[in-house]
Amino acid sequence: MKPFISLASLIVLIASASAGGDDDYGKYGYGSYGPGIGGIGGGGGGIVIGGGGGGIGGGIGGGIGGGIGGGGLIGGGGLIGGFGPGSVSGSVNQFGGVRTRAFGLGGTSPAVRGAAQGAATLSALGVASGRPSRVSGVSVGTGGGRALVSGSATPIGGYGIGIPYGVYGGGYGGYGGGYGGYGLGYGGYGGGYGGYGYGGYGYGPDLATFQGHTFGNLATGSINSLTGGYQIPYGGILSLYGPYGGYGGGYGGYGGGYGGYGGGYGIGIGSGGLGYGGYGYGGYGLGGSTLTGVSQSGPFGTASMYGQAYGAGVPLFGTTYFGGVNVGSPYGIYGGGYPIGGIGGGAGPIGGGGIVIGGGVGGIGGGGIGGIGGGGIGGGGIIGGGPIIRKKKY
């Protein structure tokens, strides 16, 4: 206990002794030198490991899972956010047969449990197709703990013939544009399924929709319950395992499956390339994947689903397994965090951040609890958090 008291006294002494001076680097939260060093209000943090943003928490947000996944005026998740207590794992065989198992989804309706499994499966198919993909669908509770699930994973972007990464950047053009239609399409769901599923919980149609995107082996998105009026983020590393190599299984190396990232034996459905091309010549594949299935809710937040998938991402041979797709509240490991953020940044109630690396709890201002980077209400932090010692002119 004594060393801690001495350290605290030393910090107070240094802060008092350095209160003056005109040449005050970082006085207002933007004079960062290293990971997590910010100023009053959280500072900018480090680019790689750093802490919160400026403004009222979050802000630019630094850190692993911060900058990309964290930040926001009042915190927030991001690209790597949305990890939670629920999980879905499953498999897709060469005939498109799908089996999934969900855990930790207690308190949600059959439609929401079905949507979680549908989103996970379609995300897996999108990843296995080897292209960034949009995922969307709908799950309708039909009573008795069952839900009908349907949706699609649509690869987006360019076709990239000739060079492995040739038009990878060009493919992103469709990424943002495609999302604009999501809201429009869902407007008709309520009317169309108005009488469907009243037997589930007895208070209106048990309906859930899901949407999101995949990139690499990362999937993010959200599940919306129109009945319950809530939204569940989902996301995570899909952890695809295929018996024939690569991310997606099949013969396609990185993307595998039908066409994949590099095509592999990219002459099947979704090839879009130039034949056998190996690593890169097969393009990103044509078309997307579709899924239909029935989800059965079980006790203690469990559910299982059996379904049929078609199109890109279905393995040519064998079975592709996927798992580690977490769904649920925004409690997070990378980004997302609430109420004290995740390890690598993300949100707090208002401030940014993480428990260990960057980010922080900060009521006002970002910062982190400890480790590298951070800050508290006014910057603070064990190592970072704003130069308390300011440069003085003599």
UniProtKB/Swiss-Prot annotation:
| Cellular component, GO annotation | extracellular region
Main location, first listed in the record: secreted
Question: Keywords assigned by UniProt?
Answer: Secreted, Signal
Species of origin reads: Pinctada maxima
Q: Where in the cell is it found?
A: Secreted
Signal peptide feature range: 1-19
Tissue distribution of the protein:
Prismatic layer of shell (at protein level). Expressed primarily in the mantle with highest level in the mantle edge and lower level in the mantle pallium.
Instruction: Tell me what this protein is called.
Output: Shematrin-like protein 2
